[in-house]
Amino acid sequence: MKTVCGVFMVLLALTVLLAYLPGNTVEAGSCSNKNCVSSCQGSGNSSGKCINSKCKCYPRG
């Protein structure tokens, strides 16, 4: 019983750490609208949007 409780506490602590530390979310690897718009505008496009975790740039004109 002591071992089961210890394992449960360790798993709980790891879950809390992963949930509240920055940079550990699934979205960290994907694009965000702010990054996408500035990246697209920097490459000469008029705008951009994050679709399915990928940047979609819209050309000028």
From Swiss-Prot:
Top-rank taxon, per record: Eukaryota
Statement: the UniProt record of this protein carries the keyword Transferase: no
Disulfide bonds: C31-C50, C36-C55, C40-C57
GO cellular component: extracellular region
Tissue expression remark: Expressed by the venom gland.
GO MF term set: ion channel inhibitor activity; toxin activity
Subcellular location: Secreted
Main location: secreted
Keywords tagged on the record: Disulfide bond, Ion channel impairing toxin, Neurotoxin, Secreted, Signal, Toxin
Extent of the signal sequence: 1-19
Gene3D superfamilies in UniProt: Knottin, scorpion toxin-like
Similarity remark: Belongs to the short scorpion toxin superfamily.
Protein name: Putative neurotoxin-A
The organism of origin for this protein: Lychas mucronatus (Chinese swimming scorpion)
